[in-house]
Amino acid sequence: MDPASIWGNRWINSNQSIAKKYMETVCKKQSLVVLAADKKTMNELNKLIDDVGDYISALKTHVDLIDDWTKEGWRDFVTKAKEKDLLIFEDRKHGDIGKIVREQMGGIYDSKSWADLITAHSVSYTHLTLPTKRIV
């Protein structure tokens, strides 16, 4: 499926790389599904990718809810998600001034390095440039 023929004017008029990436992924996988990956362990997250990764377009994660989180384990999870052509949507809802939010996107979880999208409250939006790859 060609994104331009499926999405029409949305594709043509979009100037956001993440929107186009999502539309391309949807067309490739023939799925609009963004699955809330509200799991508590790395094993549960990895099993979720094994079970449904071929049938969804994106995972919405909460990295700070993972009880057994390690940098290496999360890196392996991200690699596995990318191998399945999944976008990763980190649901953080950052809501501070831009400088603080940028620092929060680094930190122990370093979400700016692996998330395709990160949620933020509108109080922050004027100080941030999305998608996350442009923040730093």
Positions of PLM-derived features:
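Short, glycine/acidic-enriched loop or turn micro-motifs at the edges of active sites
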Residues: 41, 91-94, 132
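Active-site-adjacent beta->alpha loops and helix N-cap segments on the catalytic face
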Residues: 67-79, 97-103, 122-128
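Glycine/small-residue-rich loop that forms an oxyanion/phosphate-binding "nest" at active or ligand-binding sites
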Residues: 86-122
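Single conserved hydrophobic/aromatic residue that forms the stacking wall/gate
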Residues: 127-136
